[in-house]
């Protein structure tokens, strides 16, 4: 059985026991999280939401809070001695899926 959930403005296909990286959640390591926006449940009994499946949820455990690799942006204007260098590290949350309630 698998499900498609929406969190952080993105859609993720999840299965029980799988680990996913999502946009940062306000939870500590070891906390339980519940995703209520389930738009599809697949398996023996397929359910499609309009826009979400009624009564469906996905439960998981927060494994890690972290930051991705640095992305560097560099802008310059030729012949003007002007340049700008900026870095950004996007925060993420690693979640292990425990149960899919359909």
Swiss-Prot record:
Keywords: Ribonucleoprotein, Ribosomal protein, RNA-binding, rRNA-binding. Residues 77-102 are annotated as: Disordered. SUPFAM superfamilies: L21p-like. Residues 93-102 have a biased composition (Polar residues). Residues 77-88 have a biased composition (Basic residues). One of its GO terms (biological process) is translation. It comes from the Bacteria. GO terms for cellular component: cytoplasm; ribonucleoprotein complex; ribosome. The keyword S-adenosyl-L-methionine does not apply. InterPro entries: bL21-like, bL21-like_sf, Ribosomal_bL21, Ribosomal_bL21_CS. GO terms for molecular function: rRNA binding; structural constituent of ribosome. The keyword Ribosomal protein applies. It holds the Pfam family Ribosomal_L21p. Part of the 50S ribosomal subunit. Contacts protein L20. This protein binds to 23S rRNA in the presence of protein L20. Belongs to the bacterial ribosomal protein bL21 family. This is Large ribosomal subunit protein bL21.
